[in-house]
């Protein structure tokens, strides 16, 4: 298995400098990761630097809380695509899900899917660490209904990250035709292999190089 092609090589910390982002971009070229996952401010740079390379440009929408308005998320998506993003990882409205406002949650996802249609993959971050199993299932079902390409466990900025149990539940819920992305706390090759075995089709990690090289030291970042 070519683990590198399953990895979104990620740098989302607030204090990331241009030098930090360029390092991630160069590593993505070298190791041929699926994508680089960066904050929207770096999308244009990444798109320019990765032109001609088989590495997608992934960014985050409504990140990390998911509490911006639907209109804002849709605008962010269009803006990111205009600047060169080919994948977007959006955060659901977690509070609305917990309130049982499925209509709002679905519309939120749907509007981002429409904004990205034909131009970018949409991954929906459900923030599993804040949800009950019933809420995880509902979030996945609403994501599929709204037309998302992937469901994703975590932002890496909340109280917990991906678990094999959550990946298995998400995979069971969405079926074989929607992707499942494990992110948050995936730091070693062993971690990554467990997630893939549980049903993950993509891994979000900042320790991507350590994972590919099977360096057990991994990394210390939450993502």
UniProtKB/Swiss-Prot annotation:
It catalyses: 2-deoxy-D-ribose 5-phosphate = D-glyceraldehyde 3-phosphate + acetaldehyde. Pathway: Carbohydrate degradation; 2-deoxy-D-ribose 1-phosphate degradation; D-glyceraldehyde 3-phosphate and acetaldehyde from 2-deoxy-alpha-D-ribose 1-phosphate: step 2/2. Signal peptide: none annotated. GO terms for molecular function: deoxyribose-phosphate aldolase activity. One of its GO terms (cellular component) is cytoplasm. The keyword Iron-sulfur does not apply. GO terms for biological process: 2-deoxyribose 1-phosphate catabolic process; carbohydrate catabolic process; deoxyribonucleotide catabolic process. It is an enzyme of class 4 (lyase). Keywords: Cytoplasm, Lyase, Schiff base. The active site is at 89 (proton donor/acceptor), 152 (schiff-base intermediate with acetaldehyde), 181 (proton donor/acceptor). Its main location: cytoplasm. It comes from the Bacteria. InterPro entries: Aldolase_TIM, DeoC, DeoC/FbaB/LacD_aldolase, DeoC_typeI. It is found in: Cytoplasm. Catalyzes a reversible aldol reaction between acetaldehyde and D-glyceraldehyde 3-phosphate to generate 2-deoxy-D-ribose 5-phosphate. Belongs to the DeoC/FbaB aldolase family. DeoC type 1 subfamily. This is Deoxyribose-phosphate aldolase.
């Amino acid at each position: 298995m070519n683990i590198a092609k399953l990895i979104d090589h990620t740098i989302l910390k607030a204090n990331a400098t241009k030098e930090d982002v360029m390092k991630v971009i160069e590593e993505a070229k070298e190791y041929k990761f699926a994508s680089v996952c960066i904050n929207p401010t770096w999308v244009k740079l990444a798109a320019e630097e990765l032109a001609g390379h088989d590495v997608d440009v992934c960014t985050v929408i409504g990140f990390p809380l998911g509490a911006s308005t639907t209109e804002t998320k849709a605008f962010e998506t269009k803006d990111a695509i205009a600047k060169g993003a080919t994948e977007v990882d959006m955060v659901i409205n977690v509070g609305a899900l917990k309130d049982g406002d499925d209509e709002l949650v679905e519309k939120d996802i749907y509007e981002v899917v429409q904004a990205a249609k034909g131009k970018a993959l949409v991954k929906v971050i459900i923030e599993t660490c804040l949800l009950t199993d019933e809420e995880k299932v509902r979030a996945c079902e609403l994501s599929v209904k709204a037309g998302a390409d992937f469901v994703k466990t975590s932002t890496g900025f909340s109280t917990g990250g991906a678990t094999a149990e959550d990946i298995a539940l998400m995979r069971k819920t969405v079926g074989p035709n929607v992707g499942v992305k494990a992110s948050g706390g995936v730091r070693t090759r062993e971690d990554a292999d467990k997630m893939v075995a549980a049903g993950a089709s993509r891994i979000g990690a900042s320790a991507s190089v350590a994972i590919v090289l099977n360096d057990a030291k991994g990394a210390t970042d939450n993502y």
